[in-house]
């Protein structure tokens, strides 16, 4: 992404027309997929020696331990204060390269003038706080009001790892577009007549208000397999204290936020033991969660591209997409915007992280403040 001296992203070449694959193979394909289309090429590997497997498991354990910032300290002592001061310094240095979207709001406004904004939002950790029980990740009424307000001014979509139905139950706003299961289950607008032809995997449907929408589910052939794996994993981890399963329709989440750290390795071992018989599925990690997904070339970044095209905003020089998210899975969306120089990402984090987002905010409270400022600017400028 090109930068001005004021550290604002400059939109260069527009995004090329999205060329989506036209066919999806069934999940029964045994071990590999063609190099073209949605499927990732994953030839069957020879078994690795025990030592290498131990290293691989150790690497996953490190990721699991590092996947979420530590809990706030309940007591004060000198060592903790020194550590906090060091982290504070690291964060201040990090913000130089990923400036606050609030303190840099004028730069964002200057960039947005004369452009049509499209807003993409993660849910957990972005619109709602991260909580011990994922079923309790409820957004506040004030946040819902802020999201409703911006959605009345800009096309707005929620792109979440949760199932689409579940995230809608949390948000409860019909003004939005929803992409669940990391973009593998999208309810988007019916394409404009001047855009490219209807994608073959889109299903014409209606939403809860009777409005015509398109459903796009590129991993639909995997549903029987995902359901089967969910049952096996539920049985496998049921005796690990604190482990929790979540069925997100096109992916399965194994939450270990409430698991004792000494049991992290056991969680990983049991999950991988089940998955070894499913080469068409892959394991990824997020914030205190292991996620099982189909091996297809689809993610939140692809979902952003799909929605932009569905909205008739793809390849337009006067369009500015903004993506706000907090998790590793949101990096796919940040990368798409950065690589194509068409917009920018805002990372929600109070600790320094490697990211392709240009701006940052600390927490959902700052996300809400940013949304309110964005809505106020739009109304004042029209």
From Swiss-Prot:
The keyword Disulfide bond does not apply. It comes from Oryza sativa subsp. japonica. Keywords: Hydrolase, Stress response. Its EC number is 3.1.3.12. Its cofactor is a divalent metal cation. PANTHER family: TREHALOSE 6-PHOSPHATE PHOSPHATASE, TREHALOSE-PHOSPHATE PHOSPHATASE F-RELATED. Gene3D superfamilies: HAD superfamily/HAD-like. Expressed in roots and shoots. It holds the Pfam family Trehalose_PPase. Belongs to the trehalose phosphatase family. This is Probable trehalose-phosphate phosphatase 2. It catalyses: alpha,alpha-trehalose 6-phosphate + H2O = alpha,alpha-trehalose + phosphate.
């Amino acid at each position: 992404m090109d930068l001005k001296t004021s550290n604002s992203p400059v939109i260069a070449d527009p995004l090329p027309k999205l060329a989506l694959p036209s066919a999806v193979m069934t999940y029964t394909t045994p071990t590999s997929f063609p190099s073209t289309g949605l499927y990732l090429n994953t030839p069957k590997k020879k078994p690795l020696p025990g030592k290498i497997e131990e290293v691989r498991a150790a690497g996953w354990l490190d990721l699991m331990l590092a996947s979420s910032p530590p809990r706030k300290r309940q007591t004060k002592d000198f060592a903790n204060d020194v550590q906090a001061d060091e982290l504070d310094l690291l964060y201040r240095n990090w913000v130089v390269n990923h400036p606050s979207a609030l303190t840099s709001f004028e730069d964002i406004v200057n960039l947005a003038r004369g452009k049509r904004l499209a807003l993409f939002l993660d849910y957990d950790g972005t619109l709602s706080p991260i909580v011990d029980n994922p079923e309790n990740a409820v957004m506040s009424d004030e946040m819902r009001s802020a999201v409703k307000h911006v959605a009345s001014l800009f096309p707005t979509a929620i792109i979440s790892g949760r199932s689409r139905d579940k995230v809608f139950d949390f948000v409860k706003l019909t003004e939005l577009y929803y992409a669940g299961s990391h973009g593998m289950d999208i309810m988007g607008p019916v394409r404009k007549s001047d855009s490219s032809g209807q994608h073959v995997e889109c299903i014409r449907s209606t939403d809860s208000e009777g409005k015509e929408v398109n459903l796009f589910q590129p991993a639909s052939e995997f549903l029987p397999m995902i359901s089967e794996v969910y049952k096996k994993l539920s049985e496998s981890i049921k005796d690990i204290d604190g482990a929790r399963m979540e069925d997100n329709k096109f992916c399965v989440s194994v939450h270990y936020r409430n698991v004792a750290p000494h049991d992290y390795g056991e969680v990983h071992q049991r999950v991988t033991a089940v998955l070894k018989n499913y080469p068409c599925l892959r394991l990824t990690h997020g914030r205190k969660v292991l996620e099982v997904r189909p091996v297809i070339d689809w993610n939140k970044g692809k979902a952003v591209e799909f929605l932009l095209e569905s909205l008739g905003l793809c390849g337009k020089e006067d369009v500015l997409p903004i993506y706000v998210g907090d998790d590793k899975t949101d990096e796919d969306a940040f990368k798409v915007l950065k690589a194509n120089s068409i917009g920018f990402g805002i990372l929600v984090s109070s600790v320094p992280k490697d990211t392709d987002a240009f701006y940052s905010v600390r927490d959902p409270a700052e996300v809400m403040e940013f949304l309110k400022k964005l809505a106020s600017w739009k109304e004042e400028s029209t």
